[in-house]
Amino acid sequence: MPENIAFLTNSTDLGHVGRALGSSARPAWAIAVLASVLIFTTVVDVLGNLLVIISVFRNRKLRNAGNVFVVSLAFADLVVAFYPYPLVLYAIFHDGWSLGETQCKISGFLMGLSVIGSVFNITGIAINRYCYICHSFAYGRLYSFRNTLLLVALIWALTVLAILPNFFVGSLSYDPRVYSCTFTQTASSSYTVVVVVVHFLVPIAVVTFCYLRIWVLVIQVRRKVKSEERSRVRPSDLRNFVTMFVVFVLFAICWAPLNLIGLVVAINPEVMAPRVPEWLFVVSYFMAYFNSCLNAIIYGLLNRNFRKEYVRIMTAVWIPRRFVTETSRAATDGMRSKPSPAINNNE
């Protein structure tokens, strides 16, 4: 009980700080824009990623071992939409945090779970693409349905382990500038550097290596005259690769500013933190938030099977009987089909 009272007092202080630093200085239109962006992000996040998961479940062409990574990534994006984002909206509308320490810690934990889970799943997808295109002979053995489930389980186990140190470092707290309980970059300079390197730079390096190797192979194959070399990379495989490459690029663009700010602040928190313009910090955070709703849109724009399934699902919503019938038929069709790579057989 005393801890809750102390936290509420601190939260009140933070609320005053937030009003001093930004909330009172921000015009009503700025707050309305932030709320509108987050509402849009949350709605599209929920609807889009549910469409992804249902599409994989319903469509035999999408239902394969490799697409487990895609579903896992969709789940990571859904985590923030169901809990942290609504609490951020609550803080925006109430100009501060009044939900207590427990809610703050849970929100910060789930935010981290979603972010790191997304990074690790995107890395897993890149490695999957690399193995399928560059090491196709070993792919079937490496990515059996059982092995894929184990790899996804490993990804989430590593994600949880990566978040746990935050509770010991004390880096999860309410930041009034972004109305969110989140990772505090000024809690520990060394820990901030480790977080940026391990949770962002290393995965980005791994994904970049995988996709560069794929691009090199694609270029080499296109220059070959032999038919057997050209057939190694089918047009559908290339389109699928481009889809996931776009997902990666958008993730990197949305999260790079915030991670760069973290590295700059870590150099000397007391000196550098006040020099970071508040508008830049807020924009970088909301760019990161916005990324959670983009993947489902990319699948729909660049992938014909996902696009068709989206239309079928949205149409069937108006005819519930048809939806139930088609879903039941899909659930019993092709469940034991040969495992294939992420978004394989899609156009």
Curated annotation (Swiss-Prot):
The yes or no answer to whether the keyword Disulfide bond is present is yes
Q: Which UniProt keywords apply?
A: Biological rhythms, Cell membrane, Disulfide bond, G-protein coupled receptor, Glycoprotein, Membrane, Receptor, Transducer, Transmembrane, Transmembrane helix
Instruction: Look up the domain of life of the source.
Output: Eukaryota
User: Topologically, how does it sit relative to the membrane?
Assistant: Multi-pass membrane protein
Cellular component (GO) terms are:
plasma membrane
Query: What's this protein's name?
Result: Melatonin receptor type 1B-B
- Which residues are on the Extracellular side of the membrane? 1-36, 94-105, 170-191, 266-278
Q: Which GO terms describe its biological process?
A: G protein-coupled receptor signaling pathway; rhythmic process
Q: Which organism is it from?
A: Danio rerio (Zebrafish)
Disulfide linkages recorded for this protein, renumbered to the chain, are C104-C181
Gene Ontology molecular functions:
G protein-coupled receptor activity; melatonin receptor activity
